[in-house]
Amino acid sequence: MASDLRRVTFNYPGSVSGPVAVIGSFNQWNPLAHPLRRIDMEWRIEVFLPPGTYPYAFLIDGQVGRDPSGHVLYGPLGGRYSVLTVAD
């Protein structure tokens, strides 16, 4: 249900030229699903997600990078991802 969704804001700081997108388990790691918009000196997007824990990363100009302000999860193949927990 839509009432079970929580608003989540993803921010990527800095003056990278872009494009920047957020990829994660909530969008099947699809780089086209959630592109961020540049607002002032950061990139930003708001999405609505159900409660849960989600590994995610940023795709910055085609390169995968983790959220510099997020918690780190180490994947089974050695990759590093950020972790988002959406509370009930």
Which residue stretches match the model-derived regions?
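Aromatic-rich carbohydrate-binding modules that target alpha-glucans
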Residues: A2-T53, D61-D88
